[in-house]
């Protein structure tokens, strides 16, 4: 004798809600990742990295510094400020990616500094109209 099993109507609804929650959890960091640089690791010299609202601030304390980044993008309406010791200070920003490879850098927002800032990305760098 075979019996038929029916799935209660609540299960598909729960699955939809779970799928939407997972999608939102994945999309939020991805959107942030496109707006400001992330995954910064100071590998030479002295510098600290902080975030407040739509701005990332790099406070450089030595004449030269190197930061390896997972991703370095500046979205429209966002900004990155480099506070350096003086006008001849130099900072090298290398985009090294993460376990998923390297994405091209896109600068659509503000990038300001009082010294010299270099960005190196082997996948390429694009400056948009709003940069």
Annotated model-derived regions:
Residues 2-131:
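Solvent-exposed adhesion/ligand-recognition segments of exported proteins
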């Amino acid at each position: 004798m075979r019996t038929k099993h029916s799935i209660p109507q609540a299960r598909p609804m729960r699955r939809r809600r779970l799928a939407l929650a997972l999608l939102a959890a994945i999309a939020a960091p991805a959107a942030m990742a496109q707006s400001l640089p992330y995954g910064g690791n100071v590998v030479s010299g002295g510098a600290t990295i902080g975030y407040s609202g739509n701005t990332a601030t790099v406070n450089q304390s030595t004449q030269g510094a190197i930061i390896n980044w997972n991703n370095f993008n500046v979205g429209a309406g966002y900004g990155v400020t480099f506070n350096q010791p003086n006008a001849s200070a130099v900072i090298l920003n290398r985009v090294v990616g993460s376990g998923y490879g390297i994405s091209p850098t896109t600068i659509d927002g503000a990038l300001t500094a009082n010294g010299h800032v270099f960005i190196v990305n082997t996948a390429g760098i694009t400056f948009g109209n709003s940069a």
